[in-house]
């Protein structure tokens, strides 16, 4: 029996909550003991049912992952890999549940429609003397403070567009963020959509723009705090399209797989990625401005658990104050949710252990070679099991 895992923890959390005790109120040793007791209860129930069905097995001495002997052998094997040099420390973005404070596998995620804010944001271009701004859009405003780059495609044509007239505040019922004279760099195919969103009533295309020639950009919050006063490089990326958005992709390598891949494939180090979100899904970094410290991305408790937290509204407000918000709106997206808590998940870069399959170990052979040899030396019933394992390895 596999007696470990989040499903067990989740059930035990429910039991504690029924007694008005949150997970944070329960000491770790008490929580683990409760999980062990819960798992053992169901092992005993299932073993009794198997016996009633006439199934033979070592019911009095079963293999349990939660046996201390089993846990010790796992730790021993982990240490052997570390001593053999096949263990590597790294980081990459994974699906993370702020409610459960844990990583989730794809199998633990379900997708639901939900309404989210969408914003169009301007990045300064120091290399241009005309004051032009490059525009991105995102449905995750909370990731803007973690922005470290902007991605573009070498297959997309881009241009400089000058705003001539904008709908008035009287017409709109609110002051527009765009203004006559604004110069914006956009994908040609998407310019009309972006300028419509910005309530621009007339514009003209001025010239072609090659993003690769622009150099670094200025973070849209740079004027507000030194934390954001870093260069924002432009990276060529295969994931950038002109199907939607602006033709440019705001790149926060800590919070997206494509973002991460674009960052490291450009020769930059994973260790330079900015990690500003804590395990409970709130901003946490010693150098972040005070206005952002502790703001939650998703509410993790109470009746509004799973709803939007304070991070998105505050980031949008700061962008408006900086003069770099071009437009905003609401859209519906299909988003990942935890199948247990039913709350949205985020993508978050976390430190992880990686085991090399091809680095030679103590016997001079790689883990892949040793595993394939062990599979070959094992008799399988049915034999098809060998093929399945071999293909996986």
State each model region's role.
Residues 131-134, 171-174, 181-183, 229-231:
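Short, mixed charged/polar active-site loops
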Residues 146-148, 172-174, 195-198, 296-297, ...:
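A short, polar/proline- and glycine-enriched secondary-structure boundary/capping micro-motif
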Residues 122, 173-176, 235-242:
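Short, flexible, solvent-exposed loop/turn segments with mixed acidic/basic and small polar residues
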Residues 1-171, 252-257, 262-290, 312, ...:
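N-terminal, positively charged nucleic-acid-binding surface of large information/translation enzymes
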Residues 1-6, 158-160, 172-220:
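Carboxylate/His-rich catalytic cores and anion/metal-binding grooves
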Residues 283-311:
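A short-motif feature that recognizes glycine-rich, charge-decorated loops
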Residues 136, 186-202, 309-324:
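Short, basic/low-complexity N-terminal boundary segments at the transition from targeting/disordered tails
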Residues 217-219, 223-279:
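Extracellular/luminal Protease-associated
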């Amino acid at each position: 029996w596999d007696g470990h895992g989040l499903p067990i923890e989740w059930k035990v959390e429910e039991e504690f909550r029924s007694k008005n005790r949150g997970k944070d109120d329960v000491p770790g040793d008490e929580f683990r003991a409760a999980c062990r007791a819960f798992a053992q209860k169901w092992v005993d129930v299932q073993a009794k049912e198997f016996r009633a069905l006439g199934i033979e097995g070592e019911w009095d001495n079963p293999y349990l992952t939660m046996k201390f002997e089993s846990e010790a052998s796992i730790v021993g094997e982990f240490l052997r890999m570390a001593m053999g040099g096949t263990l590597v420390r790294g980081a990459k973005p994974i699906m993370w549940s702020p409610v459960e404070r844990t990583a989730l596998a794809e199998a633990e995620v379900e997708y639901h429609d939900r309404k989210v804010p969408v914003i169009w944001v301007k990045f300064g271009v120091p290399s241009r003397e005309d004051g032009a701004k490059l525009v991105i859009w995102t449905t995750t405003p909370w990731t803007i403070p973690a922005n470290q780059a902007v991605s573009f495609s070498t297959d997309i044509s881009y241009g400089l567009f000058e705003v001539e007239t904008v709908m008035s505040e009287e017409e709109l019922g609110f002051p527009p963020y765009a203004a006559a004279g604004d110069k914006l760099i956009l994908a040609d195919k998407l310019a009309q959509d972006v300028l419509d969103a910005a309530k621009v009533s007339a514009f003209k295309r001025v010239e072609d723009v090659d993003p690769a020639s622009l150099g670094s950009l200025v973070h849209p919050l740079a004027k507000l705090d030194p934390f954001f006063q870093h260069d924002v490089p432009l990276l060529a990326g295969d994931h950038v399209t002109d199907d939607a958005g602006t033709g440019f992709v705001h790149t926060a390598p800590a919070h997206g797989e494509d973002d991460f891949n674009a960052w490291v494939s450009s020769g930059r180090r994973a260790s330079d990625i900015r990690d500003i979100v804590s395990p409970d899904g709130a901003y946490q970094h010693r150098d972040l401005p005070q206005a952002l410290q502790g703001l939650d991305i998703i509410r993790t408790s109470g009746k509004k658990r799973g709803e939007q937290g304070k991070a998105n509204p505050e980031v949008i407000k700061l962008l408006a104050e900086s003069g770099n918000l071009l437009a905003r709106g609401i859209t519906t997206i299909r988003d990942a949710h935890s199948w247990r808590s039913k709350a949205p998940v985020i993508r978050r870069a976390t430190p992880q252990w990686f085991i090399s399959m091809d680095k030679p170990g103590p016997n001079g052979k790689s883990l892949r070679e040793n595993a394939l040899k062990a599979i070959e030396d094992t008799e399988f019933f049915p034999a098809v099991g060998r093929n399945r394992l071999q293909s996986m390895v």
